[in-house]
Amino acid sequence: MKINQVVLIRHGQSEWNTLNKFTGWHDAELDKKGKDEAKFAAILLKKEKFFFDCAHTSLLKRAIHTLQYILDELNQTWLSVKKSWRLNERHYGALEGLNKDEVIEKYGQKQVLLWRRSFDISPPQINIKDKRFPGNDPRYSHLNIHDIPLGESLEKTAKRVIPYWNKIVYPELKNNKKILIVAHGNSLRALIQHLYKIDNKAILDLNIPTAQPIILDFDNEKNPIKWHYLT
């Protein structure tokens, strides 16, 4: 692994991915395929002799467990891991827990695609009395209630992801650390869009597959150059 690279990985397939549900901040488990995907991602990394100094993930177990499977395969289970809500999947608001096909049937393919892929359009929001409100979960008890999302667009997701990159991850990169980030489709989309200046229309077409390592390349000044999938 080169010192000017960062590896991003979306978690393996979850039980709610299989059920075709909007997952968001719901803490879905990896299914068997997702566990196998995580192990295969690690095999790809091992084949290319990747070795990490730092690892980051979200507070959701589908990402945490994916990272654990990868570190186990790489014989790096001892590695210190930083976990942050800022790397969580986007919050899908009132869509969380609903079947995607049923939502399409109700609202139409075009509207659902805008909710899922556009930059600045949020899904319908929940309220703080909704059982899905993350403020009911002790893992978010340290957050100001006004920081807890009720439903996010990609733009809102980016507003929490990018500060984490700037304040936590980028200083590690500047210090030539080899970094692995295991997170979620939309938190990673937000980061890639920010780093590689993808316009708001083009980001509609970016869909990140489960457990497919993404290699971010940086120049010697730690400016992003290009990104590609490891296959």
Curated annotation (Swiss-Prot):
Answer yes or no on keyword Iron: no
Spell out the CDD domains in the cross-references: HP_PGM_like
Pathway, per record: Carbohydrate degradation; glycolysis; pyruvate from D-glyceraldehyde 3-phosphate: step 3/5
* Gene Ontology terms, MF aspect: phosphoglycerate mutase activity
Q: Which SUPFAM superfamilies match?
A: Phosphoglycerate mutase-like
Alphabetized, the UniProt keywords read: Gluconeogenesis, Glycolysis, Isomerase
- InterPro entries tied to this protein: His_Pase_superF_clade-1, His_PPase_superfam, PG/BPGM_mutase_AS, Phosphogly_mut1
| Pfam families recorded | His_Phos_1
State where substrate binds. 10-17, 23-24, 62, 89-92, 100, 116-117, 185-186
Q: Which SMART domains match?
A: PGAM
Question: According to UniProt, where does the site described as Transition state stabilizer lie?
Answer: H184
What is known about what this protein does?
Catalyzes the interconversion of 2-phosphoglycerate and 3-phosphoglycerate.
Family the entry assigns: Belongs to the phosphoglycerate mutase family. BPG-dependent PGAM subfamily.
Q: What is this protein called?
A: 2,3-bisphosphoglycerate-dependent phosphoglycerate mutase
Q: Which organism is it from?
A: Buchnera aphidicola subsp. Acyrthosiphon pisum (strain APS) (Acyrthosiphon pisum symbiotic bacterium)
Q: Give the gene that encodes this protein.
A: gpmA
